[in-house]
Amino acid sequence: MTNIRKTHPLFKIINDSLIDLPAPSSISSWWNFGSLLGICLIIQILTGLFLAMHYTSDTTTAFQSVTHICRDVNYGWILRYLHANGASMFFICLFLHVGRGLYYGSYTYKETWNMGIVLLFAVMATAFMGYVLPWGQMSFWGATVITNLLSAIPYIGTDLVEWIWGGFSVDKATLTRFFAFHFLLPFIISALVMVHLLFLHETGSNNPTGIPSDMDMIPFHPYYTIKDMLGALAMILILLTLVLFSPDLLGDPDNYIPANPLNTPPHIKPEWYFLFAYAILRSIPNKLGGVLALVLSILILALMPLLHTSKQRSMMFRPLSQCMFWLLVADLLTLTWIGGQPVEHPYIIIGQLASILYFLLILVLMPLVSIAENHFLKW
């Protein structure tokens, strides 16, 4: 009798995706982050579901309901901090996952890559709306500042902002709809993940060499299931350490002050994972220019397949491209630091230089260096 997992219509899909899936024998730990992101998504949906059972999306009670969760609900505090810090882990894994794709040339799988960019935008939108829900000072003013950016769109901007707000300022209607969308989006993300994996399994995984590995494949189970379990264990350990020892390390103390439309915090800034984009936004004195740069800082990823000028897929054997890549990483860390600093000298000029370098590296320097490497190898 044939094994049920290979014949049953539903089990067959799971089997072909997680058990008998042929995987390259050489993929390193950088390939763990896909499964870690899946685990993050599950953690976020589960903790979020239980938080939603006690949360009220009304401006008068939202802040109080979060306090109630932390003080009165059994293990409410751990749910709340798992959810908040789980978002940080989600973004750490996301950035490493995207970085891996850039380094090893995984973007040549165009459908998978573009689906990944859509997922990145969806996760960023979800995280932004989630940050508004506790209705603290930074929640309120973050929502006001970021939604206000849409007013830079010519002609329809102001109407668009008021339409999103559901009034003339961030108020009850805004909070209610943000809660609705924050609840809905993770399920849409789950569906998009399925599509992302569908596209990936059409081509199979890339590997560190960037060379086709069709002749050297091994089954996903047990080799990569056990490897992914190790990664998951490490990530959960880091997450629990964060939650149990310093849950507010990555948060903003201003968010423990209830939202007050009459009092602006001295420094409005988003969560740490948006700071690099926020720094790019602030480094351009023009409002529309800043918004365009903000969107392009992420959307530029879609151009990666077009900007690939090397004859080799991966950066594994390209030392000069590796230098450019790590310069880009250093630049993004600099932007993240600048995004959290006040708008004053010398941070302004550092932010502007880092923003210019970011686009210069991706659009000009990396493609040019790749062409030079082809030339050195007489290709």
Curated annotation (Swiss-Prot):
InterPro entries to which the protein is assigned, alphabetical: Cyt_b/b6_C, Cyt_b/b6_C_sf, Cyt_b/b6_N, Cytb/b6-like_sf, Cytochrome_b, Cytochrome_b_C_euk/bac, Cytochrome_b_N_euk/bac, Di-haem_cyt_TM
Residues that span the membrane, as ranges: 33-53, 77-98, 113-133, 178-198, 226-246, 288-308, 320-340, 347-367
Swiss-Prot/TrEMBL keywords: Electron transport, Heme, Iron, Membrane, Metal-binding, Mitochondrion, Mitochondrion inner membrane, Respiratory chain, Transmembrane, Transmembrane helix, Transport, Ubiquinone
GO MF term (any one): metal ion binding
Glycosyltransferase among keywords: no
Localization per record: Mitochondrion inner membrane
Membrane topology (UniProt): Multi-pass membrane protein
Amino-acid positions noted as binding heme b b566 in the UniProt annotation, renumbered to this chain: 97, 196
Residues binding heme b b562, per UniProt: 83, 182
Biological process annotations from GO: mitochondrial electron transport, ubiquinol to cytochrome c
Cofactor list: heme b
Keyword Transmembrane helix among UniProt keywords: yes
Gene Ontology cellular-component terms listed: mitochondrial inner membrane; respiratory chain complex III
Role of this protein: Component of the ubiquinol-cytochrome c reductase complex (complex III or cytochrome b-c1 complex) that is part of the mitochondrial respiratory chain. The b-c1 complex mediates electron transfer from ubiquinol to cytochrome c. Contributes to the generation of a proton gradient across the mitochondrial membrane that is then used for ATP synthesis.
Extra facts: Heme 1 (or BL or b562) is low-potential and absorbs at about 562 nm, and heme 2 (or BH or b566) is high-potential and absorbs at about 566 nm.
Subunit structure: The cytochrome bc1 complex contains 11 subunits: 3 respiratory subunits (MT-CYB, CYC1 and UQCRFS1), 2 core proteins (UQCRC1 and UQCRC2) and 6 low-molecular weight proteins (UQCRH/QCR6, UQCRB/QCR7, UQCRQ/QCR8, UQCR10/QCR9, UQCR11/QCR10 and a cleavage product of UQCRFS1). This cytochrome bc1 complex then forms a dimer.
Protein name: Cytochrome b
